[in-house]
Amino acid sequence: VGFKAGVKDYKLTYYTPDYQTKDTDILAAFRVTPQPGVPPEEAGAAVAAESSTGTWTTVWTDGLTSLDRYKGRCYHIEPVAGEENQYICYVAYPLDLFEEGSVTNMFTSIVGNVFGFKALRALRLEDLRIPTAYIKTFQGPPHGIQVERDKLNKYGRPLLGCTIKPKLGLSAKNYGRAVYECLRGGLDFTKDDENVNSQPFMRWRDRFLFCAEGIYKAQAETGEIKGHYLNATAGTCEEMIKRAVFARELGAPIVMHDYLTGGFTANTSLAHYCWDNGLLLHIHRAMHAVIDRQKNHGMHFRVLAKALRMSGGDHIHAGTVVGKLEGEREITLGFVDLLRDDYIEKDRSRGIYFTQDWVSLPGVIPVASGGIHVWHMPALTEIFGDDSVLQFGGGTLGHPWGNAPGAVANRVALEACVQARNEGRNLAREGNEIIREASKWSPELAAACEVWKEIKFEFEAMDTL
């Protein structure tokens, strides 16, 4: 074979519209905005090339391997309705390109270099189809939804949480006191804020000790199992594991990790530790909006959610649909199903580009958190269903009578919504009525209803299809 040096069009090698995808391929849907004058086939092929075997020129070492076996292929391109010069390009990657059990390696290949590519004005990874053969190389969530319910002995309702505020500046003892008050009032969980690690005003070991004390005291008083998400995120993997070990020694039921800032390698290590040692793992998605908020560049959160289910976590923050943080209902429910369910059909109206079979990988509980309060309870119960954690930070600690009454108000509101739903009432239509009725029997709830009656965070959502 003669070796022909020089630059050649990507589309000659990497655009293959006749390709039949294999069950073992990793499939990706990219939203591609080519530079003016670059045809979509060339742009799509360039994405496939740069995220797999290609480089900018022909190299003679290409002859030493079988490119046809290892190359990514752009197999379908469709224009995006309503957008000028924007396309969805579908790319298939052979499974052999990826290391088993490594989300890190998967992302390094698929979204590594290609996003800085000159021929593209913008590029967004909208969805991935992970083949079952690859899923089986991951351990996934340490416990999953059913095991968590069994550990906590809580069934038939969403779980309630609260982020301890002010997020920075409290001493360990005062922090532990807030934990105790919230749990005693009726919450299931309290939470370290994502940026509470180990700062001068509160070192991690002190916080863990006082929080554990608060948990046990609240458990003794209420007869319910309680937990506090002890944030184990640290500057090194070794330090992170050290914190998780200490949490386990205290008998804590759950630890927490910031998986994007901490990184997938650290997260997978922690998930393995939690699996081996019976700890639940709560995942916070700090930094996600840096990656997923722009509509035409970056990566959609549903991809980050799938990656987390592979890497491992029992809870993950997933937006509220109703609070202060962005998230459109159908789209949010799309990736909530991707987190919880075992098998999800392709449904473009919910942003799901591929049918995904998780082959019994445990599910992840979505966490709704951010600017929500008692008036949102019917909507949240309706939207997220039982397998969710509803987190009210300011919505608990902002109660005029204090933390414990704030927790009582949320618990009463939740129980009222669940009961109404079970009786067949329509939460969407009668939500306010249900909360009003319940507040007659609960002065704590009545006070909460009074404080937050008019608050709304009304802006148009950016994330539309």
Swiss-Prot record:
UniProt cross-references to SUPFAM superfamilies, sorted A to Z: RuBisCo, C-terminal domain (SSF51649), RuBisCO, large subunit, small (N-terminal) domain (SSF54966)
Record Pfam families: RuBisCO_large (PF00016), RuBisCO_large_N (PF02788)
Cofactor: record remark: Binds 1 Mg(2+) ion per subunit.
Positions contributing to Mg(2+) binding: 191, 193-194
Site (Transition state stabilizer): 324
Residue sites binding substrate per the record: 113, 163, 167, 285, 317, 369
Record-linked InterPro entries: RuBisCO, RuBisCo_large_chain_AS, RuBisCO_lsu_C, RuBisCO_lsu_C_sf, RuBisCO_lsu_fd_N, RuBisCO_lsu_N_sf, RuBisCO_lsuI
Compartment list: Plastid, Chloroplast
Annotated CDD domains: RuBisCO_large_I (cd08212)
EC number: 4.1.1.39
Chief subcellular location: plastid
Range of residues in the leader sequence: none
Modification type N6,N6,N6-trimethyllysine: residues: 4
TM helices/strands, residue ranges: none
Modification(s) after translation: The disulfide bond which can form in the large chain dimeric partners within the hexadecamer appears to be associated with oxidative stress and protein turnover.
Role description: RuBisCO catalyzes two reactions: the carboxylation of D-ribulose 1,5-bisphosphate, the primary event in carbon dioxide fixation, as well as the oxidative fragmentation of the pentose substrate in the photorespiration process. Both reactions occur simultaneously and in competition at the same active site.
Name recorded for this polypeptide: Ribulose bisphosphate carboxylase large chain
Gene: rbcL
